[in-house]
Amino acid sequence: MPMESATDTALTFRDATDADVDALVALIQSAYRGESSRAGWTTEADILQGQRTDPEGVLEVIKAPDSRLLTVERAGRVVACCQLEHRGAHAYFGMFAVSPALQGAGLGRTVIAEAERQARETWGVSEMHMTVISVREDLIAWYERRGYRRTGRMTPFPYGDERFGIPQRDDLEFELLVKELV
């Protein structure tokens, strides 16, 4: 059975609202945790169990000043999302999720390109920053193919804070990735 293309049906990009919280939590969870995440390639199921986020965390991003939760719909269904936060000369990219059934079809590439465009045009930023769990070599390689570079700057994983999941290993940390937006 052929994989769906990101361009099979038109995509709609919009800012998330309070009404989107439950759908966004379900999307983010399905993309990274549990058995459903294994349908895609971005699963963290082997390194983290439990939740990836919760309704309060998503609502916090929606409501935060200088922050947007870009929501992507296709045929009326939320299929992807990402956080954009204005931080002075750069924007922060996070909470990125693509429906596992649509991963590998170009949708993620489309979403990140649109997020970069919006950050550049809306805030006039010259860089996009993100943090990725450093052991996620496949995911880091995907970002590198999109122009992001590893900085070697690490921050600790929030061990003991189950809002971010239950670690299955003791060597987790976040690495800062940066891309010049031109």
Give the ranges of each region predicted by the language model.
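C-terminal "cap" of GNAT-fold acetyltransferases
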Residues: 61, 126-141, 145-182
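A short helix-loop-beta-strand connector motif used in the catalytic cores of GNAT acetyltransferases and
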Residues: 53-71, 170-173
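Conserved GNAT-fold acetyl-CoA-binding loop/helix
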Residues: 29-58
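Conserved acetyl-CoA-binding loop-helix of GNAT-fold acetyltransferases
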Residues: 98, 104-117, 141, 145
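Conserved N-terminal entry element of GNAT/NAT acetyltransferase domains
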Residues: 1-22, 175-182
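Conserved acyl-CoA
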Residues: 110-127, 149
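Active-site acidic-Proline motif in GNAT/NAT acetyltransferases
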Residues: 86, 99-101, 105, 134-135
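Conserved beta-strand in the GNAT
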Residues: 71, 77-85, 92-97
